[in-house]
Amino acid sequence: MNLTPREKDKLLVAMAAEVARKRLARGVKLNHPEAIALITDAVVEGARDGRSVAEMMQAGAEVITRDQCMSGVAEMIHEVQVEATFPDGTKLVTVHNPIR
């Protein structure tokens, strides 16, 4: 299987998000990379499902809460920017204050 660097990045994010989901299911609080991966994956998958940029900006901020993260993680993440593929092309989605 020959993957482009971008495809490899997307696969890595998807795998990291899956690890984060399993940890949340076990009651483990997420660290910084896990939180970013979970938010990023939600935005990418929502875009593939045909949702709008505005919808994904809002939905990205509803993926995880402060209580699901280790202490200080929410304060470290002011915004998450994701290049996502929408039905009409690739667009940059910025999620401001994604952990509330």
UniProtKB/Swiss-Prot annotation:
InterPro entries listed in its UniProt record: Urease_gamma (IPR012010), Urease_gamma/gamma-beta_su (IPR002026), Urease_gamma_sf (IPR036463), Urease_subunit (IPR050069)
Pfam family, one: Urease_gamma
Catalytic reaction equation(s): urea + 2 H2O + H(+) = hydrogencarbonate + 2 NH4(+)
A biological process from GO: urea catabolic process
Listed GO MF terms: nickel cation binding; urease activity
Domain of life per record: Bacteria
EC number: 3.5.1.5
Subunit note: Heterotrimer of UreA (gamma), UreB (beta) and UreC (alpha) subunits. Three heterotrimers associate to form the active enzyme.
Family: Belongs to the urease gamma subunit family.
Protein name: Urease subunit gamma
Organism lineage: Bacteria, Pseudomonadati, Pseudomonadota, Alphaproteobacteria, Rhodobacterales
